[in-house]
Amino acid sequence: MAVYYVNNNAQPTGEHEVHMTGCSYMPTSKTNLGDHATCQSAVRAAKQYYTNVDGCYYCARACHTR
């Protein structure tokens, strides 16, 4: 299990990225999504806040779709 966060600020392409604790690209403005076994679960949780969600290329690559 790892703690995941979603960036409160959208990327220039419109999506809000999900990051795992320890990511070098962790945003300062973020919402804690709690503990998740997979990035897929964290992305589902982030969709409660934002409709356009993507995983970080660096720490949640399995969920990065752009």
Could you describe each region identified by the protein language model?
Residues T31-D35, C39-R66:
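Short, mixed-charge low-complexity intrinsically disordered segments
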Residues V3-K30, R66:
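Short aromatic-glycine-(Arg/Gly/Cys) micro-motifs in beta-strand/loop hairpins
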